[in-house]
């Protein structure tokens, strides 16, 4: 449920936009002089026969410093409050990005398979002001972990959450945090790390924008800041991992190259941790750009989680 969209404005002030909400993918709308009308309803036939999970806003306090953290909980279709459901923590990438009250096929697919899904905006997320976003400047990952764990702590107080069946996944920056999480806690039954950075030292030297990453995300080049790079790298904590962990990355991903996933996978195998590495042929960093890849990704993640349910 990332932010984003497309618009076009004419010289006379008329505009066209992509328009959607948490229960509808984007359609086309036009507007002028304070009025807007929707032109398309591309998924009406589908939604006449498919029921979506309800999406509810959640606020909670971070255990680190008491900051308010914003999130959303997606419930399975036909949710029954008298039952208990497994919970997936789904973490956004970026890390300077945000989730919101927007449609996500991936999240709804998780919910359709009987999972609660929590997605949040930990520190570093955009849309909450400059100060909040910059809390992770040269400090990522770190206290964003506390923000995420506080969300889990908040939700497991609800009687419909099965606290014995907790799972975690995320892609790109969310993959970084997922790998970080399993190096810091064993509370999750299983994890899926998608297209992550695992070793900041190697990443800044061969990813697709080397002139950017070491200047803005790090305090300088790695050979001058070895301790900092390794302290913030999930590979440093791979020896702590006991959580069954799947990794998946596109073979044509130049943003978070395959070798990042391979490093973590090898570390897990050397420590006899149950693990799997999925290489997605032809896929770039945008795995879901091909719809069949999105469906396969969700099926792989839920199959992994189903395997480790209690």
PLM regions: where:
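Conserved beta-propeller blade repeats
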Residues: 1-18, 48-51, 56-57, 100, ...
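Beta-strand C-termini and the immediately following turn/loop, strongest in propeller blades
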Residues: 16-22, 32, 62
């Amino acid at each position: 449920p990332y932010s984003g969209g497309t618009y076009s404005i004419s010289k006379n002030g008329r505009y066209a936009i992509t328009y959607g909400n948490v229960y509808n993918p984007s359609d086309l709308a036009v507007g002028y002089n304070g009025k807007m009308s929707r032109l398309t309803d591309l998924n009406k036939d589908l939604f006449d026969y498919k029921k979506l999970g309800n999406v509810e806003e959640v606020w909670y306090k971070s255990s680190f410093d008491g900051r308010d953290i914003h999130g959303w909980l997606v419930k399975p279709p036909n949710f029954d409050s008298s039952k208990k459901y497994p919970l997936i923590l789904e973490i956004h990438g970026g890390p300077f990005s945000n989730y919101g009250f927007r449609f996500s096929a991936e999240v709804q697919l998780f919910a359709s398979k009987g999972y609660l899904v929590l997605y949040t905006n930990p520190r570093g997320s955009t849309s909450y002001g400059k100060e909040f976003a910059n809390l992770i400047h040269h400090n990522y990952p770190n206290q964003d972990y506390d923000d995420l764990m506080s969300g889990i702590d908040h939700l497991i107080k609800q009687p419909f959450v099965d606290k014995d069946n907790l799972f975690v996944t995320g892609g790109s920056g969310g993959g970084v945090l997922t790998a970080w999480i399993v190096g810091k806690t064993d509370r999750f039954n299983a994890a899926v790390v998608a297209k992550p950075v695992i070793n900041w030292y190697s990443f800044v030297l061969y990813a697709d924008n080397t002139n950017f990453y070491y200047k803005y995300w790090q305090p300088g080049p790695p050979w001058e800041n070895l301790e900092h790079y390794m302290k913030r790298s999930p590979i440093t904590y791979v020896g702590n991992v006991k959580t069954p962990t799947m990794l998946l990355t596109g073979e044509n991903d130049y943003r978070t190259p395959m070798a990042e996933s391979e490093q973590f996978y090898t570390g897990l195998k050397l420590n006899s941790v149950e693990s799997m590495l999925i290489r997605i042929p032809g896929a770039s960093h945008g795995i879901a750009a091909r719809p069949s890849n999105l469906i396969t990704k969700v099926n792989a993640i839920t199959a992994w989680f189903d395997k480790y349910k209690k």
